[in-house]
């Protein structure tokens, strides 16, 4: 069955008339949501801790800023955009004690709702609008009159207006210009984690690292190995993004295509490992492991960060990336995105 997709005419901004929307967090997604909604005529307040470095950034953009409890107390819709591991504490300490009866809760990722770390009472609508792109792109596309696609879901709908709220929010974000795909909190969470762990990060990163090590261990120059297993990956991904697997194969030489078809690096054993990791996502084992580690001060996470930040390919990577002038433009994009909190990956209510 084809997915249901909504566009501009399917959302009604008037649904948000007379409602205040609190954006909790002003990181990568937070700044884009707050500014796009504000520019769409929505009454927006940003919720941050009083000592957050993001307070001044938000005020400089002309946004109203209050503490998280204050923002939650006056909002009709609360979009929580802090990292997964912090949302439970923010909910329990700052939002749940202050939230208005019947106020809607919104998320850009289903993790905490799906795994039960946040359990709103049944009188609160709960919906999700999850952009398929980083915040600075969401903002840039909105300003350009375009939009970034989103996936959207409704988990609780006590009044029957959950979808109206979700689509109105998506329209204010600029997302309906591109399209909003209907999903569920379960589907979004589990597929998102699966993609990260098995393909986008846990797959590609490890393929690149191992390919580099095999070539350099065999005596090839690190610089040449880097070009072959890392640099050229962008070309393939761009082709795939434009026209799928067929375009990326069609665009390569016959020799490259044949090598693709007969390669045995990814085989049924890989499928079995993917199925194992999917099971851990589905049964909550991965979520529990991650959240337990975070609650203990993240010792395993920090150990792994340190271990993987010192991989051999990064001994040569910075020098070679600097050879390509367009990487300087990419760095500017990253600086712009990071300027709100320091690091996209650490965007939080701090």
From Swiss-Prot:
**Stretches assigned to the KARI C-terminal knotted domain:** 184-327
Q: Which cofactors does this protein require? A: Mg(2+)
Pathway stated in the Swiss-Prot or TrEMBL entry? Amino-acid biosynthesis; L-isoleucine biosynthesis; L-isoleucine from 2-oxobutanoate: step 2/4; Amino-acid biosynthesis; L-valine biosynthesis; L-valine from pyruvate: step 2/4
Checking SUPFAM superfamilies in the record gives: 6-phosphogluconate dehydrogenase C-terminal domain-like, NAD(P)-binding Rossmann-fold domains
UniProt keyword annotation of Metal-binding present: yes
Q: Which GO terms describe its biological process?
A: isoleucine biosynthetic process; L-valine biosynthetic process
Q: What is its EC number?
A: 1.1.1.86
- Summarize the protein's role: Involved in the biosynthesis of branched-chain amino acids (BCAA). Catalyzes an alkyl-migration followed by a ketol-acid reduction of (S)-2-acetolactate (S2AL) to yield (R)-2,3-dihydroxy-isovalerate. In the isomerase reaction, S2AL is rearranged via a Mg-dependent methyl migration to produce 3-hydroxy-3-methyl-2-ketobutyrate (HMKB). In the reductase reaction, this 2-ketoacid undergoes a metal-dependent reduction by NADPH to yield (R)-2,3-dihydroxy-isovalerate.
NCBIfam families registered for this protein in UniProt:
ilvC, PRK05479.1
What family is this?
Belongs to the ketol-acid reductoisomerase family.
Full protein name: Ketol-acid reductoisomerase (NADP(+))
What is the organism of origin for this protein? Bifidobacterium animalis subsp. lactis (strain AD011)
